[in-house]
């Protein structure tokens, strides 16, 4: 049986988040020839592509050989190559759930660093699935898509 690693990237604010579960079910039940690992950025939120993938995997997928490999960004810490903190770190807005962490501010480079780590981690993803939300900036989704494609990982865009 062949292991399939999928790199999942997507909006935190999908208007039709059910498309994520439907896509993963199609891959698991109709395309994959063995166990599936879904690597995602663990972005929280009811309409997040990552959260919807995690919810489906933990409710149905894991009974059918689908596992998740969540890789949350470390929003609290800067990397050694980040600019000095003054002016670099951003203050969280009230109710900010997109940048979970303990501090009142966050490193804006944490998401791109996490995306690069998801692309580079072994076993290497066979392909990526991107769930951008039409009309939204989708910064993280676009960043991860570019990194994956630059690494030779084909990415399929799925929009409702």
Write out the residue ranges for each language-model feature:
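Acidic/glycine-enriched connector segments
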Residues: 2-4, 14-160
